[in-house]
A protein has these predicted regions:
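Hydrophobic residues within well-ordered, non-membrane alpha-helices that form the packing/core
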Residues: 105-106, 144, 194
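Short, hydrophobic/aliphatic alpha-helical segments
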Residues: 75-84, 163-169, 174
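Extended, charge-enriched "interface" segments that sit outside catalytic cores
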Residues: 1-71
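A short core secondary-structure module
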Residues: 170-195
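Internal maturation/activation junctions in enzymes
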Residues: 112-163, 168-171
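Internal helix-loop-helix
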Residues: 40-131, 183-184
Length: 195
């Protein structure tokens, strides 16, 4: 792993990487609520430098290194990659960290694991606004925080009701509630905390 970590550290420390981080942060994402015909699209446009940084992180396994190297100091390597890349640009690290940390939840549900893990384990950055099933790589975000509870997850009020009398892991649920905050809304799927 030392060679990979050294390579990523070298890339993260380049002047070019810091320049891209500067441009990505100077040019905030912009919501494009409608297309030119007035149809609702709710797309988020990012500066090209942001996409370059996302590609750099994903192509170097900053989001999934631990899962490609389980039992071989993979999580330690994941921590090192996270630390090094955070020095260059912290905003990119949010979708990286969420995608990394969602894996145990995905693995608890075989059908969902089979559907999502191959694309989550991909090292391809695919920013296209298309269905996740058509993408070469995905990112997974999280909806946890609610106004009344902040980071106290015990006080959440969002609840899940099974659809079509199917209950349990892997079933479909109707979610009702209000999440106050979402990092990285351009992710392809979301883990949502509900009762």
């Amino acid at each position: 792993h030392i060679d990979h970590l050294a390579k990523v550290g070298s890339l993260a420390g380049l002047d070019e990487t810091f320049e891209k981080a500067k441009h990505a942060n100077k040019n905030s994402p912009e919501l494009q609520a409608f297309d030119r015909n007035g149809m609702r699209i709710d797309a988020v446009e990012f500066h090209p430098s942001y996409h370059d940084l996302m590609d750099l992180a994903i192509s170097n396994q900053v989001h999934n290194f631990a899962w490609h190297n389980e039992g071989d100091s993979g999580h330690l390597g994941q921590s090192v990659l996270t630390y090094m890349f955070s020095q260059a640009e912290g905003g990119v690290m949010c979708p990286m960290a969420m995608s990394y940390s969602v894996v145990p939840s995905l693995r608890s549900t075989p059908g969902i694991e089979a559907e999502w893990m191959p694309r989550l384990m991909s090292n391809n950055y695919d920013p296209r606004d298309i269905p996740a099933a058509e993408k070469t790589g995905v990112l997974i975000g999280m909806f946890m925080t609610e106004k009344q509870g902040g980071s106290d997850v015990r006080s959440i009020s969002t609840f899940a009701v099974p659809i079509e009398n199917n209950e349990g892991i892997g079933a479909s649920y109707l979610l009702t509630g209000h999440k106050f905050f979402c990092s990285a809304p351009m992710c392809d799927a979301f883990l949502v905390l509900a009762k």
